[in-house]
Amino acid sequence: ETGAALCGEQEALLDELLEPELNALMDSEHSLDIKQLALCSVIKRNALLRRWFAQHNKTMPSRQQILRLWQEVALAKADAEPKLQFYQDEVRRYKQRLYLVPIIDDPVNKIIEWPLTQSLSLPSGLGVLSLTTATGKNTVRAPSKDEKVTVRFGLTQTSLRIVGREHARHSKKIWQELDVAPWRRTRIPLIYYNDTLIAALNTFVTFEGKVTSEYAITIEWREAH
């Protein structure tokens, strides 16, 4: 009893001591800085990684899994896109950071009609779309009467002109320039009017979606976390 209580106290103390360090390693998307983690001792790094899973309310990985995560994902070759599955999630690496990414049914090839009059629940638990009165980065021209609004996933167009860039560019290049991690590229809702791409929500508006008159709408995407 005393041993177990002491052990529990030590864990609680570790939580308290490591919490500020873990928070310092994380960004707004809760990804971890690999370079900083690499400076820690193995014991400390393992403890930080375990607490990272705990912060996400995930099942605790074993010591062996944590070691694999470090070797196979964090230390993978620079040009690799490594990932390791933990139950319903994957740990992935992008730009020297570790991300915990939920595994979802790929929504690519789904085309969802959206009448705009009501909010729209996205497939694969990707959140909810609705119109808002505020203007923001998802402010686009309003559709004309003969334009049907659909939501799609996964860019098929190769060449795009987006607001804020002068020339048309390859879609892959745009994702890279805007720092969108590869797995997010198929999870960002794309707004189409008929077959014309208007916007990738929270990311860019195309030339065709640019506001040119007072008729504009703003779409809010509430992502599920």
Give the positions of each predicted feature.
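AMP-forming adenylation/ATP pyrophosphatase catalytic core
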Residues: 2-225
